Each structure stands twice: as C-alpha cells, then as structure tokens.
Regions:
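N-terminal cap/lid segment of alpha/beta-hydrolase-fold proteins
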Residues: 1-23, 233
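Short beta-strand element of the alpha/beta-hydrolase
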Residues: 25-33
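The serine-hydrolase catalytic nucleophile loop
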Residues: 34-47, 205
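Conserved alpha/beta-hydrolase
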Residues: 47-69
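Alpha/beta-hydrolase active-site loop
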Residues: 74-90
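Alpha/beta-hydrolase fold nucleophile elbow
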Residues: 91-102
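Short glycine-enriched nucleophile-adjacent loop
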Residues: 105-116, 122
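The alpha/beta-hydrolase serine catalytic core
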Residues: 118-224, 228-270, 289-290
C-alpha cells in the first residue's frame, strides 16, 4: 500500500495531485471542500483507516487547490466536477463509496448521478449543494456585488484563510448550471449525512433539504447538535469513520453465499473497530477544509 504524492495529467496538460492507498473494494474516494486540500484532518483520518483495514482509498486536490496545477480563481463547479470524474475514471476500478465534505458533498452527488454504475454509497459531511446560489450569493454585500459586476471577482474574508479567497462571476454563473436541490435528486444508493447543528457555513436545514430531495429510501441524517462546520473533533472523526465503515459494508460486492457475505462484513467491522478514530487524528490539524 502506498500513499505517496502522484499526479494525474488532464487533457489540458494540467496536473491533479493525488494520493492512493491500494486495497480491497469498494474504494473510498474523498471529495474535499471549497478552497481546501487533501491534507485536511478528515481526509487523513480516512487514509489511516484504509491502511488499518486494508481498504482502497483515493484522495486528490481539485484544479487550483492544494498541490494541483491551476489558479483557484479560475475554478468553477464544472471544472471541479470534471476533475472528480477524471479521478474516478482513471484512478479507480470497481465499486465506490464517495465521501464528500461541504462543496465536496455537492460534487459527490454530481459524480454519483454521472456514474451510477460505479457509486454504491455516499457519506456526506455538511453537504453544500447549490451553495453558490443558495448560500453564497444571498450573503454578498452591495460592495461585493459591485466588485463582482465591475471586476469579475471579489476577495471574500475567511476564518480559514488569512488572505481570504476570490469569489468570481464565473463561479456564480457556472454554479447555477449544476443546481440539484430543486429535486428530485436521482441517487438510489445508501446515503449517510453528518451535519453540525452549530455549523455557521452550512445550515442544518440546507443539508436536510438535500436529504429529503434524494430519491434513495436508505438515507440516514445525523445531526450533531453542538457540531461546527469542520466536524473534526475526536468524537466527530469517530462518527465519520463509523459511517464510512458502514458505507463500505453496504457497498461491498454481493457474494452468492450469504453466510460468507455476513462473515466478511463482520470481519471488516471488527477490523475497523480495532483502530479508533481518535488515534487516526493528525497531531497537527493544519489548514482545515470546509
């Protein structure tokens, strides 16, 4: 198993940085948040979980994020969706569990819709579908709107980045192309949603709207009343690890022998429980993802 930094060259010769843990199917794919990267605590916890349990795991940085090529302000939902699909198509095989955080929850849904034959389960953390239209635009001040109209961009202050980050006209206009909350959202696989009740960035009602829009009948919405947007406390990481372990069991290939299938699931659950999430948490949380 390896987790060394590698690069996937896209059609425009720009590179996507990624790390992979080779292991058993289904493969877990991490989709990070807006202006985040694959070194965040939750992404690292899942890498440690994969190594501990022998499961396959892929994490990557979108265009303009982390160690990938490109300028962040040139990014759009269309581009990042294409990145996610390229990573899935070129770097994985077999059944998948997509784990999406914040914007990554939106992209996970878009990827599941585009690749229904591959995606077998979703775990969504503070999912922010349609955030450009539903969460970002309504909060723009008159000054910000004027700057975007005049200059095509505005620097948004952020508690996650001292320098803030650009919000562009292209991002807002392109985001509208990929709206899904009008529903129904054609995803039929099991979905587990983890949402903080004290999240200042994605209201729990927004995440619940997504859960209610999914066509899947196997949707579990977990509200962590005192949880924030990051959900990176030890107890939050334990919930995440448990949700991913459950999703992997639900997504594993069907065996003709039901006894063998039950034994395999039990063994995988035991293996997941032998490495508590509190031990997987990185000592230095570093720049946290949304």
């Amino acid at each position: 198993m390896t987790d060394s930094l590698q690069h996937l060259v896209r059609n425009d010769n720009l590179r996507l940085a990624y790390r992979v843990v080779h292991g058993t199917h289904p493969t877990v794919v991490w989709l990070g948040g807006f202006h985040s990267d694959m070194t965040g605590t939750k992404a690292q916890v899942l890498a440690d979980q994969a190594r501990a349990t022998g499961g396959g795991y892929l994490r990557f940085d979108y265009f303009g994020h982390g160690q990938s090529d490109g300028a962040f302000e040139d990014g759009t939902i269309s581009r990042w969706r294409e990145d996610a699909l390229a990573a899935i198509d070129e770097l994985t095989e077999g059944p998948l569990v997509l784990v999406g955080s914040s914007m990554g929850g939106w992209l996970a849904c878009l990827a599941a819709i585009a690749r229904p034959e591959r995606v077998e389960a979703l775990v969504l953390i503070a999912p922010a579908p349609d955030f450009t239209e539903k969460l970002m635009e309504p909060e723009l001040s008159d000054e910000a709107r004027a700057a975007i109209a005049r200059d095509g961009r505005w620097i948004r202050p952020s508690e996650y980045d001292d320098g803030g980050y650009p919000i562009t006209r292209a991002l807002l206009e392109d985001g509208a192309r990929w709206s899904i909350l009008a529903g129904p959202v054609p995803i039929e696989v099991p979905v587990r949603v983890l949402q903080g009740g004290a999240d200042p960035d994605v209201p729990w009602t927004h995440a619940l709207e997504l859960a209610n829009s999914l066509t899947s009948t196997d949707v579990v919405f977990t509200l962590i009343k005192d949880g924030d947007h990051r959900l990176s406390r030890p107890q939050d990481l334990e919930r995440l690890a448990a949700a991913v372990a459950e999703a992997r069991m639900l997504a594993e290939p069907v065996d003709d022998d039901p006894v063998a299938r039950r034994l395999a699931r039990a063994a995988r659950a035991r293996a997941a429980g032998q490495a508590p999430a509190t031990a997987w948490a990185a000592a230095d949380m570093g720049p946290e993802e949304e």
